[in-house]
């Protein structure tokens, strides 16, 4: 069994922590004006690893919320995986040099697979690929466009590239609290050797329990956003279950 990590999500829009519904920037809810305060709260709750996305950057194709990200890096000791607007090796190098533990390459993984290979070779274990699927097909450009390739097609391209993880998001569920699409995520994880992290729709403690079932043994973790912000998921209870599963493994 993979060591399961529950990643609390910080999505940045105009320097603030927001949650979107199905990736729609027009359907954003602000949950905290200060990302540093939010990251500190997650650290105090016992989380081990932050998942941060520069939403504006994902649409712009380059970092936009760099100041907010850097403030979190300076003020909060937790490792961070960061996505959004990372489309070239220079940006990968810059973020890893500033203390980001792992970068997530999304759109560029579809458009420029050579970048993923180069980045993973230059920074072993510090490059992840974000695959966000709508009706099975991978969406790009901040989910504004849908490609003609499936998540599995792209994941298989990187089997031998040495990437740290694939973050698989079901766009149809994202931000709607309908529960993780574990069937699709497990099917992907069972078809490749790369660790897979589930995202999109995390709703309650039931998702944590499902994540720890034997059938999900190849999953490396999950990302939770709105369920934590809305109080539907008790972080203490969730982390207790995960730590108990680790101890028993």
UniProtKB/Swiss-Prot annotation:
It is an enzyme of class 5 (isomerase). The active site is at 11 (proton acceptor), 132 (proton donor). Its main location: cytoplasm. GO terms for cellular component: cytoplasm. It catalyses: 1-(5-phospho-beta-D-ribosyl)-5-[(5-phospho-beta-D-ribosylamino)methylideneamino]imidazole-4-carboxamide = 5-[(5-phospho-1-deoxy-D-ribulos-1-ylimino)methylamino]-1-(5-phospho-beta-D-ribosyl)imidazole-4-carboxamide. InterPro entries: Aldolase_TIM, His_biosynth, HisA_bact_arch, Isoase_HisA-like, Isoase_HisA-like_bact, RibuloseP-bd_barrel. It holds the Pfam family His_biosynth. It is found in: Cytoplasm. NCBIfam families: 1-(5-phosphoribosyl)-5-[(5-phosphoribosylamino)methylideneamino]imidazole-4-carboxamide isomerase. HAMAP family: HisA (MF_01014). Belongs to the HisA/HisF family. This is 1-(5-phosphoribosyl)-5-[(5-phosphoribosylamino)methylideneamino] imidazole-4-carboxamide isomerase. It comes from Nitrobacter winogradskyi (strain ATCC 25391 / DSM 10237 / CIP 104748 / NCIMB 11846 / Nb-255). The gene is hisA.
């Amino acid at each position: 069994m993979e060591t399961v990590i529950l990643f609390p999500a910080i999505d940045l829009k105009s320097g603030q922590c927001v949650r979107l519904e199905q990736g729609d920037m027009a359907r954003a809810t602000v949950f905290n004006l200060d990302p540093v305060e939010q990251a500190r709260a997650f650290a105090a709750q016992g989380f081990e690893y932050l998942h941060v996305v520069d939403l504006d950057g994902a649409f712009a194709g380059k970092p936009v919320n760099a100041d907010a990200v850097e403030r979190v890096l300076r003020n909060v000791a937790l490792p961070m995986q960061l996505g959004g607007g990372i489309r070239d090796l220079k940006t990968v190098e810059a973020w890893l040099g500033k203390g980001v533990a792992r970068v997530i390459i999304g759109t560029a993984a579809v458009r420029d697979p050579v970048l993923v290979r180069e980045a993973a070779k230059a920074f072993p274990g510090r490059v992840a690929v974000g695959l966000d699927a709508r009706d099975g097909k991978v969406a790009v450009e901040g989910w504004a466009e849908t490609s003609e390739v499936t998540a599995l097609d792209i994941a298989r391209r990187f089997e031998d590239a040495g990437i740290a993880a694939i973050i698989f998001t079901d766009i149809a569920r994202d931000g709607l609290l309908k529960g993780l699409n574990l069937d699709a995520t497990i099917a992907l994880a069972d078809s490749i050797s790369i660790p897979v992290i589930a995202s999109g729709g995390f709703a309650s403690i039931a998702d944590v329990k499902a994540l720890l079932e034997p059938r999900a043994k190849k999953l490396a973790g999950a990302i939770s956003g709105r369920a934590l912000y809305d109080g539907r998921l008790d972080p203490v209870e969730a982390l207790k279950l995960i730590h108990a599963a680790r101890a028993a493994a």
